């Protein structure tokens, strides 16, 4: 089978890249070892985070770091055995999270977020996926006035600097919005601009069907089997040999299975996360996507039930599941909302692919003329899928990307 482009990885990033190339007339083969959207993209909190112009930094407060070191929290957990391996990544993550550097990174990151809703909207229309989208923002609920007031000030800054819309909620207003939520919260914050997704895997599959309607082909195979040819690239798949002029690495946390073999070294880390679905107790309903701000877990009312998602687990990518955060979160969540029984046989786990400077790698590989990268989107893979696909496709076709790619180039890591 011959194609113009092979896209390695069929998560939301890879599918979005494939769609954007196919929309521009390229013949594309999309490859994954599993079905589309069945890895990291399957289990997120279902938010297209238009408010997320400031990437999640590494804590700088010594007291907070000391509390994290106790390893008993919901928002962060670590495997002690993995610390020596991940320490270089964490050190650079901490370095890039220092205030001045973090502010500069946020300025470079913001254009991606600013295009997130617009680009999703185009694909949602073409994929006829409107039934999966809720255009009602999401909420943060606060246990303390200190955290509430700090986040209110942060929201005011985002409104001033970026036009991000928000609504401050009193205790009573939060109770009116979520009548079955605990009355222990002192208030809330509603981010009005983001969209929510009732079934993140369903949205990836809707984009996948759009890709196939544009003439694209999906095949299963091992991305590590990629090799160069005089005219480009080839890979053996379960459906036979595929050859193409160009290849895109969109493998998320598994990008190194290809990049390392081709001579590129990226200091990447993963933030593993877990979810479980629950039925609400009879006669109750959760109306909004909601985070328990001081505890760091998320409740999302999805098609499959109320999805509880955890914060970050710092561990080896391939280590066995250790859903201690999920069980901690469930115990706390049951005190603030009447969750019913578990709806999943076991916890789901995924791995967010993270760079130390919190920005994805998007663009051309430095030492291969027809190799392209699109990975490292951390918490915002779902949010940034379509805009990543667009700017990469524009660059591959020799067009001027709507957002300059320089801030996201691989060269910043000297790989």
Q: Could you say what each language-model-derived stretch is?
A:
Residues 162, 293-294, 334-415:
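C-terminal catalytic lobe of FAD-dependent flavoproteins
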Residues 169-177, 217-233:
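A conserved short coil-to-beta-strand element within the FAD-binding core of flavoproteins
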Residues 3-30:
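N-terminal Rossmann-like FAD-binding beta1-loop-alpha1 element of flavoenzymes
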Residues 87-209:
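Rossmann-like flavin
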């Amino acid at each position: 089978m011959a194609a113009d482009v092979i896209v390695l990885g069929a998560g939301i990033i890879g599918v979005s890249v494939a769609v954007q190339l196919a929309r521009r007339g390229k013949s594309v083969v999309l490859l994954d070892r599993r079905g589309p959207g069945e890895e990291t993209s399957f289990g997120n909190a279902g938010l297209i985070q238009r408010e997320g112009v400031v990437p999640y930094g590494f804590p700088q407060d010594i007291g907070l770091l000391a509390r994290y070191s106790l390893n008993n929290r919901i928002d962060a957990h670590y495997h002690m055995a993995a610390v020596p391996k991940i320490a270089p990544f964490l050190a650079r993550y901490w370095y890039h999270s220092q205030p001045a550097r973090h502010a500069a990174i946020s300025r470079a990151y913001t254009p991606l977020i600013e295009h997130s809703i617009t680009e999703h909207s185009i694909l949602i229309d073409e994929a006829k996926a409107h039934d999966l989208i809720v255009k009602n923002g999401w909420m943060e609920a606060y246990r303390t006035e200190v955290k509430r007031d700090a986040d209110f000030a942060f929201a005011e800054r985002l409104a001033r600097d970026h036009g991000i819309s928000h609504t401050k909620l009193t205790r009573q207003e939060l109770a009116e919005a979520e009548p079955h939520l605990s009355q222990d919260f002192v208030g809330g914050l509603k981010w009005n601009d983001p969209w929510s997704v009732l079934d993140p895997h369903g949205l990836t599959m809707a984009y996948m069907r759009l890709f196939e309607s544009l003439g694209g082909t999906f095949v299963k195979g091992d991305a590590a089997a990629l090799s160069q040819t005089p005219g480009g690239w080839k890979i053996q798949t379960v459906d036979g040999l595929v050859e193409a002029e160009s290849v895109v690495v969109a493998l998320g946390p598994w990008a190194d299975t290809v990049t390392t073999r081709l001579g590129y070294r990226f200091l990447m880390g993963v933030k593993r996360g877990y979810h479980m679905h629950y039925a609400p107790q009879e006669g109750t309903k959760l109306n909004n996507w909601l985070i328990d701000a001081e505890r760091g877990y998320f409740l999302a009312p999805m098609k499959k039930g109320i999805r509880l998602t955890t914060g970050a687990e710092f561990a080896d990518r391939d280590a066995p599941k250790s859903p201690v955060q999920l069980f901690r979160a469930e115990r706390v969540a049951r005190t603030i909302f009447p969750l019913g029984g578990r709806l999943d046989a076991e916890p789901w786990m995924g791995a967010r692919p993270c760079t130390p400077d919190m920005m994805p790698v998007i663009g051309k590989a430095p030492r291969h003329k027809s190799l392209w990268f699109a990975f490292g989107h951390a918490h915002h893979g779902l949010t940034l899928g379509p805009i990543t696909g667009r700017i990469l496709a524009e660059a591959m076709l020799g067009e001027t990307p709507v957002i300059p790619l320089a801030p996201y180039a691989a060269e910043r890591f000297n790989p």
